[in-house]
């Protein structure tokens, strides 16, 4: 039996970060992973989709290069196999990097399935491991709901989750996407950009349910303008090979496509944890703001705790959990200050309250909304569509939320995340000099608008 101070199950963005942080703090650490280092995010999620989106953006930009005075002879085309190959190379480089970091930090790595026998004992194949603290980072799996015919279509390879779709070797001409959340709209953007006929079937009233209404309205209009068909308030009733039957307002219809993407969410991966008898919350491991479970010395981070299924949240939870486990001063996680990003053309970045939530809580708030056209850099870049919307407490100008719909929006939201974490006000952040010409002036103008009035709007 080998003894460890910290044992981490799962090598995704939560698990490997937790393992490295624990080793940096002087602990003897083991990391167990049954599949690939990097988890869903690196292998089948965040990074692969961004690689595809970069190729899509390049393709779209070249097609409009005449707007910038550039001429392309004989048109432009794409090679799907080369796009796939580029994605695979990026993923391989990053997974190799994680492996290097584990060795650098002297972390023992076990490749296999972890069966937890007790809070301090874990079996991995023939290895029995003992640990003082246990970090569960087993992630989640894509969910295929019990729709008649869905499992059969999945087994035949016609219906796919995001994991399989990212390995697609041939380009589909028609794609049906069940689910209008983040995964659904990002894949819709990818395939639409290369010319696929894309339809999104969403059960709720809108896509991206829960995001600020102004953002959802603008983004929906943009997707539709690009040629993506969006059907809301839809119930998928049957899948028969490549045919998806749905009802909308009582009317039944069937749509045929080359590929069906099931993007209705994920389920926490609890396999191997049964003997712990952990307290659950909606089929995810229940945790507090230090990621502690119902069992002392056992922590759960990332998708498995169901709080926010985002890679950056998992990584942060890993650091907090390990710091707390090793009895160092840990800062509890405030889950109301989590930035969320959606990648497309344009992008969406959001943190904190939406205007609708502020209204529902009957808060005395002020909304400052600035058009992207007020920023000179955006015009030079040939990007005109978008806005930033800042929500503040009217009395003290405390930042309640920020919602950005613009190109490179995801690179702007961190300023607000820092401001909110430090409990700064719109006035205090507006005193920082923002460089010109940069896209950061969009958030600066929104701050000025919250304090008094913007300069360029």
Region locations from a protein language model:
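Beta1/beta-strand and adjacent pyrophosphate-binding region of the FAD-binding site
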Residues: 1-12, 171-178
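Rossmann-like dinucleotide-binding cores of NAD(P)H-dependent redox enzymes
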Residues: 84, 89-95, 99, 166-167, ...
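Glycine-rich FAD pyrophosphate-binding loop
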Residues: 23-40, 196-207
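A Rossmann-like FAD-binding core segment of flavoenzymes
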Residues: 73, 108-111, 115-123, 129, ...
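FAD-site-proximal beta/loop scaffold in flavoenzymes
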Residues: 152-171, 254-327
